[in-house]
Amino acid sequence: MQTMKTKVAIIGSGPAGLLLGQLLYKAGIEHVIVEQRSADYVASRIRAGILEQVSVDLLEQAGVDQNLKEKGLPHSGIEILTNGQKFRVDLSALTQGKQVTVYGQTEVTKDLMQAREQAGLCSFYESNDVQIHDFYNAPKVTFESNGTHYQIECDFIAGCDGYHGVCRASVPQDKIKTFEKVYPFGWLGVLADVPPVADELIYVQSERGFALCSMRSETRSRYYIQVPLTDHVENWSDDQFWEELKNRLDPESCEKLVTGPSIEKSIAPLRSFVTEPMRFGKLFLAGDAAHIVPPTGAKGLNLAASDIAYLSSALIEFYTQGSEQGIDQYSEKCLQRVWKAERFSWWMTHLLHRFETESEFDHKIKQAELSYILGSTAGQTTLAENYVGLPYEIKSLDYLKHAS
């Protein structure tokens, strides 16, 4: 067995692990990334596409925002379609100029992987039998890669390996508490190389169920419709999908909708999930390893980024100043923001979807609530503040700015 030593072992090379690695690299902190999947698989995963303002700022501080600046699509508002009428929520006007940016998680991942490769940083892909050990005292990571067995001795382990990863599963059950809500429907999503139906996202509340008109670029669109959990992708031809989407849109949007062959089609179940705490001795959980949100609020990737903002700040503070304050506060600070994002994502999901179990009274109440929100500046402000992203509880991210 080959033994290595480093300061931080990062398990998982999704956006959370890669972003943490990039920020640690900028601060001169040694680290290694261990990933079970291949680099090609990681780079090709199709995920979220909306970045909060604070996530964009964090990628800039990490020095990986060149493509984001060139190809990202800033959006200052969203549209909500209900009862056949569209209402625009002016995000920027309601949040002192803040906005969101359309830039796919796939592109964020590729940018971070390219920066890592150019810097010649150590990553192990296609790692087998990844295990973490003794993370309350002397952390170690063991795995096999290309026929060689490795042991990494480190100061800390960052568990960025997703919902099904080994890190959370390695925590003793009496040390961890989980909270979960599974929703009784999924999203059937289609990716197509057609221009978007509108310049901004359209969220649809309809009698036939939720729909979302989104995009990845000016020439690639992403559309979703609510379907039962029992449904299967094989049940939907492209023509059937487009027809059902039109049934949920207003006449103007139907007229503008450009259809075409799908290049990806899948059904994603919706769930809310939170782990408490997010730190176990010298093991930190971040991103999907610690929490899942339904995609309605566009918070999954952004929560991973905020976790990494707190974690990188804490580690930089520890290695540059010898302070453990950030480490000790990591879980508490993250969870404050996580639960607010969970609330917003749950609220958006509940407000815009049809539940089979809801009564006509429940349905009328939801319509009244949405009508109130859209007709009230205060209501729209609440939605907008959460949508563009709540601020980080870090003093201007001073440590990260210094690291960059």
Curated annotation (Swiss-Prot):
Substrate binds at Y203, S214, M215, R216, Y224, P295. Signal peptide: none annotated. FAD binds at E35, R45, I46, R47, A48, G49, I50, Q105, D288, L301, N302. The keyword Flavoprotein applies. The record marks Y203, Y387 as: Important for catalytic activity. Its EC number is 1.14.13.2. Keywords: Aromatic hydrocarbons catabolism, FAD, Flavoprotein, Monooxygenase, NADP, Oxidoreductase. It catalyses: 4-hydroxybenzoate + NADPH + O2 + H(+) = 3,4-dihydroxybenzoate + NADP(+) + H2O. InterPro entries: FAD-bd, FAD/NAD-bd_sf, HB_mOase, RIFMO-like. One of its GO terms (molecular function) is 4-hydroxybenzoate 3-monooxygenase (NADPH) activity. Pathway: Aromatic compound metabolism; benzoate degradation via hydroxylation; 3,4-dihydroxybenzoate from benzoate: step 2/2. Binds 1 FAD per subunit. Its cofactor is FAD. It comes from the Bacteria. Belongs to the aromatic-ring hydroxylase family. PANTHER family: P-HYDROXYBENZOATE HYDROXYLASE, TRK SYSTEM POTASSIUM UPTAKE PROTEIN. NCBIfam families: pbenz_hydroxyl, PRK08243.1. Homodimer. This is p-hydroxybenzoate hydroxylase. The gene is pobA.
